[in-house]
Curated annotation (Swiss-Prot):
Residues 34-44, 69-79 have a biased composition (Basic residues). InterPro entries: Rrt14. GO terms for cellular component: nucleolus. It is found in: Nucleus, Nucleolus. It comes from Candida albicans (strain SC5314 / ATCC MYA-2876). Pfam families: RRT14 (PF17075). This is Regulator of rDNA transcription 14. Belongs to the RRT14 family. Its main location: nucleus. Residues 27-79, 186-219 are annotated as: Disordered. Involved in ribosome biogenesis, probably through modulation of rDNA transcription. Keywords: Nucleus, Transcription, Transcription regulation.
């Protein structure tokens, strides 16, 4: 490029220098701004003490709610299982009385009664050893009567030998009888004391004896 004079050349060079200076300055400034922004984004913001307390309370509430939910679920399942067990006991109790009242028992009925007798004897054997010899003798007597009833039922009989058996109505002791009867004569550890008290009644499960048992008539 040719210049007419030195003055025009100087002016042109000065203009070019200003342009380059402006361009370079702007680029440097934009880079520094972007770096400062990236640094500010990378640094985590400090959490205030109030926010920390709120977070802790929320965590505690969540844990408490989970524990309450688990506790409610456990109690609900426990109630359901208890209801199902009571219904099962009642159903077996009805089945036992229905079979026992039959004059002509089928082979399946006899097998069911025989199974009850065996289970009751096994349950009596599982009771802890009793120091009272009198109660021990009564338990042995019950076992013998259970075996005799088993033989008598197997021959088609409907009642124990040696006397007439009368049926009592299920009044106040109905719930107790159903609770103690499980259809297979299993005796829970919580009822052992009651079994000892009622052990003088012959028949199947001692808890059932008051329903069907009555002293011989003097007639």
């Amino acid at each position: 490029m040719s210049f007419n004079s030195n003055a025009s050349k100087y002016q042109a060079e000065n203009t070019v220098d200003k342009l380059f200076s402006n361009i370079l300055h702007t680029s440097t400034t934009s880079k520094s701004v972007s770096k400062s922004k990236s640094k500010s984004k990378s640094k985590p913001k400090p959490i205030s003490s109030t926010q920390l307390l709120v977070n802790q309370l929320q965590s505690t509430n969540t844990t408490a709610n989970n524990n309450n939910t688990k506790r409610k679920k456990h109690n609900n399942n426990k109630r359901i299982n208890k209801t199902l067990l009571e219904e099962k006991k009642f159903s077996k109790f009805i089945k036992y009385n229905h079979i026992k009242q039959k004059s002509n028992k089928s082979e399946l009925d006899e097998k069911y009664l025989n199974k009850l007798v065996r289970k009751n004897i096994n349950s009596l054997n599982k009771i802890n050893k009793i120091d009272d010899l009198l109660i021990d003798e009564e338990l042995n007597q019950i076992k013998q009567e259970l075996l005799e009833e088993n033989e008598f039922v197997g021959m088609g009989g409907g009642q124990l030998k040696g006397g007439k058996r009368l049926r009592k109505k299920l009044l106040n002791n109905t719930k107790q009888v159903i609770d103690e009867f499980d259809g297979f004569g299993e005796i829970s550890s919580s009822n052992n004391n009651n079994k000892k008290k009622n052990s003088s009644y012959p028949g199947l499960t001692p808890g059932l004896a008051p329903v069907d048992y009555e002293e011989e008539d003097n007639e």
